[in-house]
């Protein structure tokens, strides 16, 4: 059987880190939003005597021209798509021959959950083929692959807490014209979190984040987040912009350029270094993409996606 899946990127309209956990991970509070920038997956699978997974990879033209991410991509067993497929089949008790064709358009290691989106797409596709799990079971499986994979599986607009796997759908999706842009640098998530730990004293409570004032932890975060989105169409804050990383200088330059091109709000997404700008109209956003591309900077037009 052959299944086509769109693997949509996400942005963080709000992102705060609330605690460092005993297991070394961090608890977050984030408003995550699915956007139309996507990778494409075509997955074929049929039962076989033993499991074999093959991944073929194509880099999208814009990504190839501006972002130069191809060297960072693996088509081997360490690719998260292969990990997702193997996990699904092992838990389902199925041996299968799986073929995956991936067209990559989401920048890598950019805070856009490109790999997580691909993993979620693989899980959805395999479940359409084999139907081994309920939605709830598939969500539990996705959490084993990474903190952003559960949201990418569910999609839409949501308040995410815990490591990101605790998801509350906000039942409201702002209609936003978005430009996503990224320079040449990349930021590993581990490096970004280590920088935050240094600034916020391992989140022991002695140094407070501005995010707590914007979206306080009072048991009503979901209602507050929904109200903020409905009133302004945005709730922009990202604690990683306060991490002191040297890479933030390039981030700030792109944010400034987006503002010069008419963005009402700009923010780094995830642990960076991708940046998004919110524009009043699609025409303004298209113009910004054109000007950034002319300057040799990766930029892509996106819209919010409703689920």
Q: Where is each model-derived feature located?
A:
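DPxDG-like acidic metal-binding loop motif
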Residues: 81, 110-138, 151
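Short beta-strands and strand-loop turn motifs
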Residues: 14, 103, 234-237, 268-271
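Conserved glycine-rich beta-strand-loop-beta hairpin in the small C-terminal domain of fold type I
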Residues: 273-275
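Conserved, helical-rich catalytic subdomain that frames metal- and/or nucleotide-binding sites
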Residues: 154, 159-265, 280-293, 297-307
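ATP-binding N-lobe of GHMP and related small-molecule kinases
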Residues: 1-110, 128-133, 173, 182-183
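Phosphate-handling active-site elements
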Residues: 89-101, 125-145, 282-294
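Residue-level signal for inorganic ion chemistry
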Residues: 13, 41-43, 81, 115, ...
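Glycine/threonine-rich beta-strand-loop-alpha-helix active-site module
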Residues: 131-171
């Amino acid at each position: 059987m052959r299944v086509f899946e769109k693997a949509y990127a996400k942005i963080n309209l709000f992102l705060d880190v609330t605690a460092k956990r005993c297991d070394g991970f961090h608890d977050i509070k984030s408003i995550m939003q699915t956007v139309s920038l996507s990778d494409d997956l075509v997955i074929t699978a049929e039962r076989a005597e033993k499991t074999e997974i093959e991944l073929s990879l194509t880099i999208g033209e814009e990504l190839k021209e501006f972002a130069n991410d191809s060297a960072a991509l693996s088509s081997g067993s360490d690719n998260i798509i292969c990990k997702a497929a193997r996990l699904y089949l092992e838990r389902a008790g199925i041996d299968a021959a799986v073929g995956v064709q991936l067209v990559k358009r989401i920048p890598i290691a950019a805070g856009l959950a490109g790999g997580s989106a691909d993993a979620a797409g693989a899980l959805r596709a395999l479940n359409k083929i084999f139907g081994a799990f309920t939605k709830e079971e598939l969500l539990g499986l996705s959490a084993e692959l990474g903190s952003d994979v559960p949201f990418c599986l569910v999609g839409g607009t949501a308040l995410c807490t815990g490591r990101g796997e605790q998801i509350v759908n906000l039942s409201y999706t702002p209609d936003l014209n978005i430009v996503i842009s990224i320079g040449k640098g990349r930021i590993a998530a581990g490096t970004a979190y280590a920088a935050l730990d240094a600034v916020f004293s391992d989140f022991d409570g002695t140094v407070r984040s501005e995010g707590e004032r914007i979206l306080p932890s009072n048991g009503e975060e979901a209602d507050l987040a929904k109200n903020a989105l409905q009133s302004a169409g945005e709730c922009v804050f990202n604690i990683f912009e306060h991490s002191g990383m040297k890479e933030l200088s390039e981030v700030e330059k792109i944010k400034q350029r987006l503002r010069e091109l008419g963005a009402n709000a700009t923010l780094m997404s995830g642990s960076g270094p991708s940046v998004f700008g919110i524009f009043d109209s699609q025409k303004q956003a298209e113009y910004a993409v054109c000007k950034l591309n002319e300057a040799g900077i990766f930029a892509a037009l996106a819209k919010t996606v409703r689920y």
